[in-house]
């Protein structure tokens, strides 16, 4: 993570990530899903002609602005492309995109009824043309042959007007013999929902949120249902299946398999936000346990944690400083990465960027220059224990806090990455109000100015938008940790809740800020994502440990980039015009956990 590496993308999947130990649970789940979704052959009968060649015909200087189209015609093509994808998926119509180059080489019409367009091992009975302004002559001939054999052509919107870049009207006459639909959501949904499907979502309201894919093997069909909504839980969605088949639910989280009851050729499936359900349809009924479901009782809300634990010290990033070059003040106060650019510009050095030459590839002598950095830290409560200062890249020559010399012997311990050196700052060196941390170092082209990090058993509180050192909170409330003394903390937070002893119950989280969660109640620790309820069993200890695994965003940034959600994060995202305002992600338990007890009990003075 040294220097620019902490702003590289994608980020590290190694021990620097708070969630790296929990990542195995996610990989196991996705590996099971990946294995199942590769079985047999796709149940896919629709081919959508990809309009990429219509885009290439319109390419010219200035057609694009960064990653976005700049021309109205290009924007319209991109919009239509997105719209058609979502409309088809909302009707549970699985499809493949057809590239005209691949079709010219590998596609052929199979006239045996029902007619099919054969591409490799796939056989398509329907071809959809939407958004194409120009197609190849070979594509037009293929579509004409497919239509003549009885294949279904669906033309959405305006048919192509150009063939190989020249104006032709043949597409319009071919479209007149096919199915014409306006480029309107209601018409597209109505048509495709009316088409026969072996598996169908019977609730149109829920169907708009569910994407479906199926795989056919020799003895079964696997149906994969994904709730694309990240905020809406879909309860008891009726799914119609072929007559005479039995249903099984395969849980990719732990590999368990359960029987799903079939009533009137329908199964009932519930989907938490973002959840995937894998349903196996087969002709032989197996002896399987029933799917465990939470009891249909009123939930108990856990609103008051009995305590909490942190697995790392709290942290305050120091990313604004004053800079001196050989006793000349270059800048009285600025963001640290801007100071680095200022210093490199003054010294005639190449700026650090994603295209910079790696330090170990440089040749020749490396001249160094004496610099001094000063960070200001506000303190409203004096620390009771020593703090640690994490520095990187620049070996300190001298280090002082409020004029008190600090030993340059590195303190024992480790924090996040080996690039950080830790220095102990005695509690006696701090004072109420403003504190000054200064260090001198030798700067060279292979170095870089980076933020420092203050670590310890202290709280960090915002006063008029400025972070101030105070007391670490004694308890945590349900809500955003940013406003509870832990705004920049990025380790793990373990919430402790009192629960009745020796009880079976289900735990559900509707909203949290972090990467994932883990729960234990005296037994095995369960890692989970999303808001799917999980079963637990309390022991005699009567304590539910709910651990929230955060990510490093609020520690390493970008800390000042507005708005919070960006289309992408790159090295340039870490500098901005106003580094005095912080833009942090909400972390912690953002709403009270819900518990569903399987037996009637008295909990918190209330009969459940």
Give the role of each language-model region.
Residues 1-451, 457-491, 498-502, 595-596, ...:
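Carbohydrate-binding surfaces of carbohydrate-active enzymes
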Residues 130, 138-142, 155, 415-426, ...:
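C-terminal structured "cap/appendage" subdomains that terminate the fold
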Residues 151, 491, 509, 515-516:
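Glycine-centered small-residue hotspots that permit tight backbone geometry or close packing
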